[in-house]
């Protein structure tokens, strides 16, 4: 499961996904990591899609110290609806994370190389 993703052409991708994109230019991102803020697409109450910024990761509402907790960044499609951590978000709080690549860091000694 990958812990980094890329969004190399955010303006084109988000304009295609969201009718409410305000047109503000966004810079390409090649190393989006957990806990970083990135653009996503959400549906408003009337169903129109809007681009908003959200922090990557899901911290359970039962966490005692959210500021020092590691967020969940992966879920298995075959069990996501059964897990307490994801169940309510899957039903009521969905979003589209615009990405055009994902990768993990491959480590060899002290050197790290991104592997797609």
Regions picked out by a protein language model, each given a short descriptive name:
Residues 1-116:
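Short linear sequence motif anchored by a di-proline
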């Amino acid at each position: 499961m990958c812990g980094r993703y890329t969004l190399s052409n955010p303006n084109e991708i988000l304009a295609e996904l969201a009718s409410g994109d305000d047109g503000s230019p966004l810079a390409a991102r090649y190393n989006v990591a957990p806990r970083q803020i990135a653009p996503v697409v959400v549906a408003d109450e009337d169903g129109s899609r809007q681009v908003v910024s959200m922090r990557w990761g899901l911290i359970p509402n039962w966490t005692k110290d959210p500021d020092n907790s590691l967020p969940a960044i992966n879920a298995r499609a075959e069990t996501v609806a059964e897990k307490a951590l994801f169940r309510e978000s899957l039903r009521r709080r969905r979003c589209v994370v615009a990405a055009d690549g994902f990768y993990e860091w491959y480590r060899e000694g002290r050197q790290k190389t991104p592997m797609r």
